Amino acid sequence: MGLLSYRAATEADVPLLVGWHADPEVLRYWDGETFTDDEMHERLARPDVDMWILEDGGEPVGLLQSWREPDPPKRGGLDGFLIASARGRGIMPAIARRLATDLIADGWTEVTVDPYEWNERAIRG
């Protein structure tokens, strides 16, 4: 495992995100939803959700979304996925903790993560 980081997803990431969401190994963690380029551009523009590209040693390996509740206080949750080759190495818990810590430092009062009940690996993380 290299240096773990996250960065804001940009319009340049749309082809990557569309491709990831078309992967059956990702689809199972995303309610089977696939997206066109236009739909992904719309998703990036949502005011209540920020999308983050997860990187391992500078290579993109997954996505986290931070979503906000509409009413104060500032609170919300995280959800996301890793590509198959990045799973099982502690990447998601490490980056999710870092992002949650940064959100709290930015004034969030609560950050939740609610993996699927069948996703035992995520629950253990």
Model-predicted segments: where are they?
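Amphipathic alpha-helical recognition patches that constitute DNA-binding helices
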Residues: 16, 39, 77, 81, ...
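Conserved N-terminal entry element of GNAT/NAT acetyltransferase domains
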Residues: 1-15
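Acetyl-CoA-dependent GNAT
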Residues: 11-12, 28-87, 102, 106
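Conserved catalytic core of Hanks-type protein kinase domains
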Residues: 20
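Short loop-to-helix capping motifs
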Residues: 23-24, 119
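Conserved active-site alpha-helix within GNAT-family acetyltransferase domains
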Residues: 89, 93-94, 117-125
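Conserved GNAT acetyl-CoA-binding A-motif
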Residues: 105-116
